[in-house]
């Protein structure tokens, strides 16, 4: 569940309770950490008919459960492949954008997503470079306006833990940077 993108997916909780025979409690999972860097930004643009996505993710060592002290060989290094990560990063967005049928999540059929996932010498904060093709190509100004106006359920409810501006676009050419922008 990404609350700003697919809050309706909590409907599967009732099916889960029936399947497990429980009246209280449930298991809810968040999406893969790498797709959280780009799926929310693409979600409000789906109305333009996203055809293809090429995403290159630059994943911090925290995603591997490591620190620089426990993984010194990552310093001054890039690991060009993270086992299993590309497959997850190509399938999970379709699940996030999917619909609920008979208490189950049915993945979206499109877009076609291709990823390359790299581990980089950054302590915390994943980054993604994303290239998108659309059926109806929006202008840069249209995209920026959609991102500026986008509000998910947490923002509409003014939840205290929700960021006021869910999607933030940096005007600077050299941003975002994990060290400067992760918090």
Regions found by a protein language model. Give the residues of each.
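Charged docking surfaces used in two-component/phosphorelay signaling
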Residues: 62-183
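N-terminal Rossmann-like NAD(P) cofactor-binding subdomain of oxidoreductases
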Residues: 1-74, 78, 112, 145, ...
